[in-house]
Amino acid sequence: KRNYLKSYVIGALVFFITQICLRLPLINNVMVKFDSFNIFKSFYPVAYIIFLGITAGVFEECGRYMGFKLTLKKHRRFGDGVAFALGHGGIEALLIAGISSLYNLIILLNLNLGNDNGTILGMDANEAMIAFNSVNNISVLTIGLERILAMVIHLGLTMIVLYGIKFSKKHYLLIAIALHAIVDVVVAFIGSIMGSLFWVEVWCLICAIIFIIITIKIKEIFYKEV
C-alpha cells in the first residue's frame, strides 16, 4: 500500500508558495509601485485580465512541474497525481472558502453572545447582521460547487503535468499553462461582461467535464505501464 501523504503535502505547498508567497505579493505589493503597471492595469483591462490568467498558469503549472521533478522523483504514479491535486486544490479551498466561513462564524458567535455595543470585525452590530444575512443557502451551494469544479480542474492540470514528466514530453507543461490560462481568462471575462455567477459556473462545469475525460485517458495510459 503506497503512502500518498508526501504527494498531498507537496501539492499544498506548491499552491501556497507559488500563489500566496510569490505571485500575489509580486502583483499586489511590488508591481503596483510602478506607474507603468498601474497605467496598464487601468487603461488596458482586457490585457490585464489576460496577464493575470497567464501568470496564474505559469506560476502554478511550473510549481507542479518543479514539485514532481525535484521532490517527488519516486512518487509519480496516478495516485500520487490525485493526492497532489487534492493537496493543491484543498489548500486553495481552505484559504478561499475557509477564511470566508471563519469570518461568518466570528460574526455569528458575536451576535449570539449579545455583542450589540462594540464592533465586530470593524463593523457595528447592524452592519455585521447585514453582512451575515447576505449569506444564503444559494451562495453557500455556489461556493461549494465552485470548489468541487476547481478541484476537478486542478486534478486534470496536475495529470497533464505529471504525464509530461513521466513520459518525457516537456511540451505538456506548456499545454497545462495554456489550458490554465484559458480557464482563468474566460472566467474573468464572463464575470465582468455578464456579471452572473451562473455562467461562470457553467463554464467551470464544461472545463471540469473536459478535464475528467483527460484524467480518465491519462489513467488508462498510466495503468498500462504497471
Describe the residue ranges of each PLM region.
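Hydrophobic alpha-helical segments at protein termini of multi-pass membrane proteins
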Residues: K1-V226
